[in-house]
């Protein structure tokens, strides 16, 4: 049995080739992992209403076409794997907003995502992207305790105390990343894990290799372009080449795609602030503040806006 866990089997079932590939991951998130249309829409940068309609249409087509939901054979797993990895990552990402670990459901979802990644790693040990995903989740989870101060305030990565990071998770992540690299088949999750690995080095060296991070984001946007990667690349290049360079990269992103993407406005606001463009920075901060439901992040952005 290639897939020993029932939830993993159901995830692969949702990636049936007769189903619209764009709906594979959303269906997994809703039907197997229990996310609602709001959380799924947030992950895919669309409104909850639009995502709900897409899910409803997909289910209607499944019923009308009488698609048989069967466990895939071992030789069918590779072509369904990417959607499953995306679903596990999106499930973990939906828990990331609960930085303080106060929401039991969010904590449970993060734990389940990491557990599923470990089970999948054991089931497909020679697939480097599975190990890359696990390494990425472990690196992120290692920093969760440092994302909130004792008073509940939001602490950005650059200001976190690395001594609070969970060393056992970082060590496990590094082992997974090393094994994945030995396969010499680079993929999106391995690059993202490598970026987090560079950040984790600060716990050992006291510094962050910003040029390396910028280079990895260059690779990521070429291999797996996305709005999130493009915004993060702009922020990374700003750290190396200055705010103007970062802003130029932000300006290359399609404006329509980032209208409701909060990280874009937060990065843009900070870069404009560094360039002493006070009015434009204030407007961007206001957009970023209006797009977050997290009180701690809102307070953090308000404080930045007042600088």
Which residues does each PLM region occupy?
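Amphipathic helix-loop-helix modules that constitute alpha-helical solenoid scaffolds
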Residues: 1-37, 46-218
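Alpha-helical residues within the helix-turn-helix
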Residues: 42-44
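Alpha-helical junction/boundary sensor with strong preference for TPR arrays
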Residues: 117, 124, 184, 217, ...
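Start-of-helix register in tetratricopeptide repeats
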Residues: 129, 192, 228-229, 263, ...
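TPR/TPR-like (Sel1-like) alpha-helical repeat modules
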Residues: 278-296
